[in-house]
Structures are given as C-alpha cells and as structure tokens.
Amino acid sequence: MFKGFTSILVFSAGLAMAQKSPVSSVRLYVFDCGNLKSGNPQPLLDRGVTITDMSVAAYLVVHPRGTLLWDSGVIPDDLIKPGGTTEARATVFKTLKSQLAEIGYQPSDITYLALSHNHYDHSANSNQFAGSTWLVQRKERDAMFPATPPQNPNPNNARFSALKDSKTVVLDGDHDVFGDGSVMIISTPGHTPGHQSLLVTLPKTGPVLLSGDLYHYPSERTLKDFTPFGNLGDPQTEAASKAKVEALLKEKKAELWIQHDILAFGKLKKSPAYYE
C-alpha cells in the first residue's frame, strides 16, 4: 500500500532541533486553530450538508524518534489578538505557538513539518517552523515555489515563503516518517497537485487518518459526484485518492478524522490532553 520514492534536498536553514521530551510511544495532540465560514453555503445545503461552517486544526505527533507538526492554521499567530481575531471568513482565538508552549514545546523543538497542502487555511504559521525538516510532495513544492514566479502571487503565499530554504525531504508518494510504520504520509493528490493525508497508528486509540482536504464534510463519502471545492483542483485525481483512502481505512480498520468537520472536531479532546 505504501509506495513511493523519497529524495532529500538540503538548503541553508539549520537542522531541526531534537524533540522536547522523550516518550516511549506515539502521542497525538489536537490543536484548535479556529473556524471558517462558508463563502457560498447554499449549494452545500442543497446537497444535504447541514452545517457548512468548518473547523481549522493542527496536530502534533510525538514519537520516540522526534516530533511532527501537521498543518499550521489559518491566521498567523502575530495577528491574533486577545479575545480572538477575524480575517476574511476565518476566526481564531488561540495561537498555535501558545498551544505548543502549553505542552512544553516551541517551534525549534519540532523535528518535522508536513502540510496536507499549501492552501491558506492549512499553512498560515509555516514560517515559524522553517527550522524543521519539511516533508512535502514534489508536485506540491513545485506549485508553491514555481520556477517562474507568477506576476500576481497570492499574498497568503508569503506565510510559507521561508520554507523555500528549509531542509526538505521531497516525496514522490507515501512516506514512513519515523521508519517504523506508525506515522505514514499518504499521497492523496487532486485537491492540490501534491495533497497528502496522514495515517497515525496509536497504541491505544488505534489507527487514525487525518484527511487534510481530501474531504471537507462527511457527506462527501456517500454522495456521488459531490466535490464541494472541485473547482480548486483535479476532481478525477481526487476521486482516485478518495478510493485509495477508503481502501486503506478498510484495510487498517482506521478511523477517519475529517479536519474541517466542525461537529466531529468539537468532540475531540484538545491539547493539553492527547491521544495515545
């Protein structure tokens, strides 16, 4: 199931720092990075989506061999004010950095950074982790840092610009992060050229798959031809990725955590509590 090739590019940024505190087994922390209002809810309501607002999450995997931060929020920490900040359709009350600090970590303690994809609601604080080793699909990195930069770049791209010089592991498929099969990056292109999801096998909770934006709402798993944001990517490639993940969920008897599912996200325990 896990196939692909990995190559390593070493840039000028320093090596990632060692993990903060050794652990004997894998832990998964869930960070609340705010919520998003739907910009066009009616088509979603017409297809049976009852709540169109979306949660925004980031996750910290703590492994005996290091740490992995998965996604980095929707509004940069330095813009978050006491009482919360709203930017466009996003509202955030807690900084990512403060949630890390609450469990004893700072950005320099993060061994690896992996983004499900480059969109603004998953990458806002990426520059804080430029000293970590960045795990990214080749096609995603090429889209983020094209050989010929666009004349009118998205201003949100500045929020991950420091990753260009990070120590980088460039992926061409699935990737075993720590070498023991417990934390697997799963290549799921379609929503973006190098979109990826994350399978974490926890000793007590069991296997959990973090969706990224492969799914936004649970309805997508049962409604045919329902890709609410298909205009952003390649629907046919995304459909193949969904089939791959559904087969993987069945094979591993894994639980799917849809990162934007605001109802399911509300039921998850948040850091400083953790799953193990």
Describe each region flagged by the PLM:
Residues L113-S123, T188-H195, I258-I262:
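Histidine-centered catalytic micro-motifs
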Residues K20-S25, T91-D109, Q137-S187, D234-K253:
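Metallo-beta-lactamase
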Residues P76, A88-S98, L199, K204-E276:
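Cap/insert and terminal regions of metallo-dependent hydrolase folds
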Residues M1-T6:
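Bacterial N-terminal signal peptides that target proteins for export
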Residues K81-V136:
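Active-site metal-binding motif and surrounding structural segment of the metallo-beta-lactamase
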Residues L9-A18:
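Hydrophobic h-region of N-terminal signal peptides that target proteins for export
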Residues G34-S98, S197-Y215:
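Conserved beta-strand hairpin/beta-sheet module of binuclear metal-dependent hydrolase folds
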Residues C33-G34, S72-V74, N118, K139, ...:
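Active-site metal-binding loops of divalent metal-dependent hydrolases
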